[in-house]
Structures are given as C-alpha cells and as structure tokens.
C-alpha cells in the first residue's frame, strides 16, 4: 500500500486492456502534491525500449521514473523478453535497499504479455485481460471488467474506464493518454 505524504508528488490512474489483436495502456495526466493539483498534463504512459513495449506508471513520480529507467536497462539486457526483463527488475527491486523504498507501480505490455510490477517486487499477469493501478485503479478496473465482454475495442474500454475513474477519483483527471500495440 502506498502511503500518501503531503510533500510527495502522487496520484494517477493507469489501466490496461488486452482484447482481440490489441493491447492498450491508458493513463491520466494529473500530478498531485498533497491535496493540490500541480500539473494536469503529465505523460505517465509511454513507449519504451525499441518502441515495442508500452508502460504506464503510478505512485511517487521520481520513484516511477527510476523504475522505468531500470526496466529500460533490463530490456536492453534482454531484448524482446518483457517477462524476463520484468522478473530481473523484480529481483533487483526486492534485494536492493534503495529500490525497496520506492513507492511506485507500473503496468507494462508488449505484443505477447501484460504485466504489473508492484511496489513489493511482484510481477503479476492480469485476469480477463484487464488490470489497473493507482489512486483510481479500482474504479477503472471495475469499469473495464464490466465492458471487456462487450463489442467495444480495447481502446474504447480503456478510455471509458479512465473517464469513470476520473469522475470518481480526485487524484485522476480527464486528460487521457493512450498507447497501443498490436497483440499476438
């Protein structure tokens, strides 16, 4: 569980949907410092590696960037092996005293697999092709799960889930960034 401190930058919602031949990660743009919105258009979803991996991060911003950089380094070490790179990052996360204190989570996906990298060094695969993290993660997850069996596309589901989360969660806004990849 991520504790909220008034002097730490927090807040976001990230959702991933894998459906049909697409995988999507969507996130909002709000950065909060305590109970103040510091920025509304942050980009917390992006392509990494050679552009064949998409990632979204939630939690303390500086910590999330540290983890993103570490994952990119692991992807260089293990090209086109997202699962292996993520497991190796998780090993480092659990054993490194500095990394263990990082308060962030990430959702990552390539054409084959979607994973959540948690603050405790766990690597999890989603059930039903849907997963969400962050302050509005539970709202986005519930919305996406409700829509995944409809005829909506992965991107439509992710956007609607983010809209619902932004309506409910004060740390999430409607400035939605979406990245997608073709899935196998």
Swiss-Prot record:
Family annotation (NCBIfam families): ATP_dep_HslV (TIGR03692), PRK05456.1 (NF003964)
UniProt xrefs under CDD domains: protease_HslV
Domain of life: Bacteria
Annotated Na(+) binding sites: 166, 169, 172
InterPro entries assigned: ATP-dep_Prtase_HsIV_su (IPR022281), Ntn_hydrolases_N (IPR029055), Proteasome_sua/b (IPR001353), Proteasome_suB-type (IPR023333)
Entry GO terms, CC: HslUV protease complex; proteasome core complex
EC number: 3.4.25.2
Gene Ontology biological process: proteolysis involved in protein catabolic process
Catalytic machinery residues: 12
Name of the protein described by the UniProt record: ATP-dependent protease subunit HslV
Subunit architecture: A double ring-shaped homohexamer of HslV is capped on each side by a ring-shaped HslU homohexamer. The assembly of the HslU/HslV complex is dependent on binding of ATP.
Activity modulation comment: Allosterically activated by HslU binding.
PROSITE patterns: PROTEASOME_BETA_2 (PS51476)
Any one Gene Ontology molecular-function term assigned to this protein's record: threonine-type endopeptidase activity
Gene responsible for this protein: hslV
Family: Belongs to the peptidase T1B family. HslV subfamily.
Keywords associated with the record: Allosteric enzyme, Cytoplasm, Hydrolase, Metal-binding, Protease, Sodium, Threonine protease
């Amino acid at each position: 569980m991520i504790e909220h401190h008034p002097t730490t930058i927090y807040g976001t919602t990230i959702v991933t949907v894998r459906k049909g031949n697409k995988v999507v990660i969507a996130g909002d743009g709000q950065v909060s410092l305590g109970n103040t919105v510091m920025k509304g258009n942050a980009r917390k979803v992006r392509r990494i590696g050679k552009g064949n991996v998409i990632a979204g991060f939630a939690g303390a911003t500086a910590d999330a960037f540290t983890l993103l950089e570490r994952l990119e380094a692991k992807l260089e070490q293990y090209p086109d092996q997202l699962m292996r790179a993520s497991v190796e990052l998780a090993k480092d996360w659990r054993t490194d005293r500095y990394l263990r204190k990082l308060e962030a989570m990430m959702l990552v996906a390539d054409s084959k697999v979607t994973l959540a990298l948690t603050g405790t060094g766990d690597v999890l695969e989603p059930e039903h092709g849907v997963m969400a993290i962050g302050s509005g993660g539970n709202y986005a997850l519930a919305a996406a799960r409700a829509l995944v069996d409809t005829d909506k596309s992965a991107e439509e589901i992710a956007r609607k889930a983010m809209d619902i989360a932004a309506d409910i969660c004060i740390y999430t806004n409607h400035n939605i960034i979406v990245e997608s990849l073709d899935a196998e």
